[in-house]
């Protein structure tokens, strides 16, 4: 059996730690009363690695009492291995195929907050699904801020280069037009506290009408 087959075989019965948290509504005792939206459209977060999609997504899910899904965690649960291992065994092309399949399924769910991977917008079919099926929020941050947030993270295969800052800059140049293409809302994350950022997002989501 080859490496790819081993990767597939693990997908059904070897979930990773943290998958349960990513697959259920995020709510804690003592939380403020839930905010409500006038629709059940899913909310999709896009942006570069380190933009805060997972952290902000959890905050939104808590505020709205919605299910939170991290697309990378979803892939890890299906494959039974971490994202860097998928890259190592199947390369970026193999990872993107798996990512696209998971995204197509997840974007059909209602009342979710979905944090996508930084490169999920590269495929045209992914961009179409994001645009047509929910509200897309582009979480924007500068290259310097992204570098500061990701510099100690060893689970970023695309940043395993001699100059991660330059790599981030190149990725930003290639991807930012695609983020803007799909975005219904653009939010600069900067150094704003997560709770403050989430609170500022809620009225925008309540007022937004998908065209």
Swiss-Prot record:
Catalytic activity from the UniProt record: shikimate + ATP = 3-phosphoshikimate + ADP + H(+)
Where in the cell? Cytoplasm
Q: Got any disulfides in this one, which pairs? A: none
Organism superkingdom: Bacteria
Q: Where does substrate bind?
A: 72, 96, 118, 175
Q: Could you tell me one molecular function GO term of this UniProt entry?
A: shikimate kinase activity
Q: Which cofactor does it need?
A: Mg(2+)
Q: What is its EC number?
A: 2.7.1.71
**What positions does the entry give for ATP binding?**
50-55, 156
Q: Which InterPro entries match?
A: P-loop_NTPase, Shikimate/glucono_kinase, Shikimate_kinase/TSH1, Shikimate_kinase_CS
What does the cofactor section's free text say about binding?
A: Binds 1 Mg(2+) ion per subunit.
Keywords linked to the UniProt accession: Amino-acid biosynthesis, Aromatic amino acid biosynthesis, ATP-binding, Cytoplasm, Kinase, Magnesium, Metal-binding, Nucleotide-binding, Transferase
Q: Would I find Cell membrane among this entry's keywords?
A: no
UniProt lists the family membership as follows: Belongs to the shikimate kinase family.
Q: What does this protein do?
A: Catalyzes the specific phosphorylation of the 3-hydroxyl group of shikimic acid using ATP as a cosubstrate.
Q: Indicate the quaternary assembly.
A: Monomer.
- Tell me what this protein is called: Shikimate kinase
Organism per entry: Bordetella bronchiseptica (strain ATCC BAA-588 / NCTC 13252 / RB50)
